[in-house]
Amino acid sequence: ISPQICNSATLSTLHGCPPQEIERIATYLIQEKGLNTFIKCNPTLLGYEFARKTMDEMGYDYMVFGDFHFRDDLQYEDAVPMLTRLMKLSDELGLEFGVKITNTFPVDVTRNELPSEEMYMSGKALFPLSISLAAKLSAEFAGKLRISYSGGADYYNIDKIVGCGIWPVTMATTLLKTGGYQRFTQVADKVEGICPKKWERIDVDALKKLAADAITDGHHVKNIKPVPNRKSTKEVPLLDCFYAPCSEGCPIHQDIPQYVAPVSYTHLTLPTTPYV
């Protein structure tokens, strides 16, 4: 059994970590451990004004966040020369270097969502910020900076992300929704055949377009009409507690899963499912 468990590492530092420390840790991983290294970057690199304006335009104006983390986190003018040096070092040692976009984006707890002062934005609201940072850094480095991605990736955008030359892609929020891990099947089908065998560079123009489109994309903007609460009041046991929320949420409690599967195979019998 090989003692080499893996040949790569992604460095995630706490908010406010000085750039000198980030660079020293990354240099150690590259130089001393010989690891292909990625550094997680925060949406705060975009600047407070851009983040606030984007959230307001997309209907997320109720999200409260100040400029503290934008001032305290790694600054863009420090990040670019640091990434340039680490890219050069990795290249000299025959290793890969890149960034992971993005780490968390703190917002204030204002409606007792969690028993804390801050919580972290995720999902479709985070995507426009994360993909905008990806576009900004890609333009800065002419597509030569490798990017791995997390930050609102799901079925609706995974093919576009990978198509720009960004992978691997990590997702979590979408798995908390109906379907859970089975959503990976849809995702896999959508990206099949898109990802080349070898990474060359990022398509900067395609990525810029994706970032611009995300701000007005209906899947990512806040719905004007509030989404109804889909949480069930039904008591379920600790184990074997899965049931279809579509049946519970249906006003007349149709056995929806009973005909969804036959519909996919065109074996639908209309007399038993008149409302399809």
Model-identified regions with their sequence ranges:
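Catalytic cores of alpha/beta
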Residues: 153-166
